[in-house]
Amino acid sequence: MLKRRRTFQAQEVGELDFSEELLELGVLIGSYRTARGIKQEDMAKLLGMSRITLSRIENSWLPLTMENFFKMAAIFEVRPEYLLQALARVTQRKWSRKGED
């Protein structure tokens, strides 16, 4: 028997809240930058943005574009999916604690 896939209505998708995941992604990016000894100002220059803009991304005040996400992965010398897997591990632990697996 095939499982029926649920289709989302546009309104439902618009109501989804990913703020926790975006916060975690910003923190993750900041952690990788710090662990690699890259100053915020230096990374911002590599990305073609101001240090303030990078700070706002790392603090989830501004969204991270896919283009900048891929650039960051290149700067960190990791595959983009590695960062996404790290994000998935963090959010999975949080969801498991909430009983939402």
PLM region descriptions:
Residues V27, S31, K45, R56, ...:
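DNA-binding alpha-helical recognition surfaces that contact promoter or target DNA
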Residues V27, G37-I38, L64-E67:
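Residue-level signal for the short linker/turn that defines the boundary of a DNA-recognition helix
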Residues E67-Y82:
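DNA major-groove recognition helix of helix-turn-helix/homeodomain DNA-binding modules
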